[in-house]
Amino acid sequence: MSKNRSLLLIFTIVIFDVVAANGLGALLSDYVLNLPNKPILLTAGTAVMLAIQLALSPAIGYWSDQRGRRPATIATTITSLLSNLLLLPVQSWGYLANRCFKGATNGLYSVMRSAMADQTEKDELLRYSGLLSFIAGSGTILGPMVAGVLMLVYSGGRISPIPTVILLLVIGALNIGLAFLFKETSPKEEPVERKEIVKKATNALKVVSLWNQLAEADKELPGIKPMFILNMLATLGMGYYAFFVAFMTQSHLIMTPREAAWFFLEYGSLAMLANFIFFTYIVTHVNKRKTILFLSMVGVVMQGLYAFSESSQTMFYVVAGVDAITVSIMTGLTGSILSVMVKQGGSQGEMFGNIQALGGLASFVTALINSLLSGVSMKAPFIFCGLSMIAVFVWAMRLPENARKYTDAKSMEELEEEPAEA
């Protein structure tokens, strides 16, 4: 399989998985219809998924390093399909069980990042990994965007979640077929002991152990730890993505499933277009740290405007449009820089798994905090995300020199030229 076809397959597998995992959008409220504190429960489902991801992503990444990327890809796509079967009974227990199983398969994204790193050079990896990081991190936007098309063309899809669930099952089945077509990018047949897999998973739950592994990696590749902290702060700042459904359906906006579908179609389309243009044509020509500083300040303003858009759908749409073409680029940008650094350090699958696990921890924290804050005020989660954006700005300003080497270089190929110039 040619490199271009392989990369296209990687993107398709990730997009299909993201849609299959997050496609219900506003219809998720049907699963908690008769329960109190619906905004809290809607966001709590995401928190449960990310907590399980924390344990299993490093284990899946390690498995892909030992046995290859293809077996891990096939196994996670099959499990992802099975998890969506739990959504057929429209019950709260089915939704929570689905989130638990989905958390067990989110290691797929670290495997796909590893497969991409296996076959691309630094500047290619910067561009492609940026797009992949955006797609994987924007599931709560892109999933409802794609599934929203069904709601717009078929009225039954706005009344019951079942037609959408069937669509997600079809997408999941197609993804299994794509996984079997995926050619190995890191052929290995090294033995994997069950004890070692369990050890990786249990160590991941000990966040201190993961943090210590990151500190060790920083000794071999100086700069990766502060860059990862920047990525975590950006993840905290983007936590409002998982809050959108609760905000649109449970706040004074009271948007219908049809209106929510139009919103996700607008936001998702603009964000995908902005990220495609940026990572295809711009990323290798700009100072990435200055770009992050600019985006974080725009993010602070956007969060303030979101907090006061509850009374006006028009204002909400305008703010979201500006947000989509600017701030949505941030997590892809920090994630792509990390991917280049990990490629230099080796042990890609396990390291990507650790990064996804700790990134999942950041997402879990923001989902949990937003769940609790939404019980106080629907504005409060945006205030928290705004404060996180300020933290991104401050940390990027104080980024140490060994990390700035990566963020300030326009082309990643410049990094190889430095020793020769010295």
Predicted regions and their residues:
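Conserved MFS/SLC helix-loop-helix module at the cytosolic interface between two early adjacent transmembrane helices
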Residues: A55-Q91
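A late C-terminal transmembrane helix in Major Facilitator Superfamily
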Residues: G345-G375
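Helix-loop boundary and gating motifs at the non-cytosolic
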Residues: S2-L50, G223-L230, A234-L253, A260-F264
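Cytoplasmic helix-loop-helix junction between adjacent transmembrane helices
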Residues: N98-A136
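Helix-to-loop junctions at the C-terminal end of transmembrane segments
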Residues: S57-G68, A274-K288, S374
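Juxtamembrane intracellular "pre-TM" segments in multi-pass secondary transporters
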Residues: M1-N4, E184-F228, E414-A422
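Glycine-rich segments within core transmembrane alpha-helices of 12-TM secondary carriers
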Residues: S129-G148, Q356-T366
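Structural signature of the two symmetry-related core transmembrane helices
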Residues: P71-L85, K290-L305
